[in-house]
């Protein structure tokens, strides 16, 4: 995706939208992550539920999404506005972020902890340019990267299952 954007295949970036959602309402309420019940080492729930420790969806999850957005676009945020829904521990369950970049482009970003357990969540980035649009979808079992150009051309890039949202994890060589 980064190479496509650097090579100006979609032209000058005018807008970016992205969303990241995952099943973490328990953590933001101060309840330990149920998926770690059988693990030898369980993370402290306060890691995600204490506002003084950077808890909440924005710090804990959207940081991953923004790393992806900024990595592939090379844009620099200039102005940012955010609305959120607080949890009982006063950290954010959701985020609705509007952004203006230094090149004049705009961005609309969303994050939510309200996803059913065992779903895996959503992670996508869409980059709108003067020549076309890049779609990068990293939802588990729906991984895809494609470009739709204004001239009618479509370019599809194969992404293997598991090489999307989990691709930044460790794998056996």
Predicted regions and their residues:
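Predominantly a Rossmann-like dinucleotide-binding segment in NAD(P)-dependent oxidoreductases
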Residues: 1-81, 88
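A sequence-level detector of short linear motifs
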Residues: 12, 108, 135-136, 155-158
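Active-site donor-binding loop signature of nucleotide-sugar glycosyltransferases
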Residues: 18-20, 111, 129, 159
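Juxtamembrane/interface motifs at transmembrane-helix termini
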Residues: 33, 128-129, 156-157
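A short glycine-threonine-serine/GTX helix/turn-capping micro-motif
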Residues: 53-59, 157-168
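Contiguous beta-strand/loop segments that form the cofactor/metal-binding neighborhood of enzyme cores
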Residues: 60, 64-144, 169-173
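C-terminal helix-rich "cap/oligomerization" subdomain common to oxidoreductases
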Residues: 102, 149-152
């Amino acid at each position: 995706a980064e190479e496509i954007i650097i090579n100006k295949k979609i032209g000058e970036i005018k807008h970016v939208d992205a969303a990241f959602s995952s099943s973490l309402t328990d953590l933001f309420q101060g309840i330990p992550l149920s998926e770690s019940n059988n693990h030898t080492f369980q993370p402290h729930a306060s890691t995600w539920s204490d506002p003084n420790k950077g808890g909440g969806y924005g710090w804990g999850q959207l940081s991953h999404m923004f790393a992806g957005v900024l990595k592939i676009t090379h844009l620099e945020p200039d102005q940012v506005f955010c609305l959120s829904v607080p949890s009982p521990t006063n950290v954010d369950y959701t985020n609705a972020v509007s952004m203006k970049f230094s090149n004049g482009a705009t961005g609309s970003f969303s994050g939510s902890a309200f996803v059913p357990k065992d779903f895996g969540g959503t992670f996508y980035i869409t980059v709108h340019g003067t020549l076309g649009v890049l779609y990068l979808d990293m939802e588990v079992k729906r991984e895809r990267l494609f470009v739709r150009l204004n001239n009618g051309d479509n370019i599809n890039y194969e992404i293997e299952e598991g090489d999307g949202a989990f691709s930044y994890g460790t794998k056996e060589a």
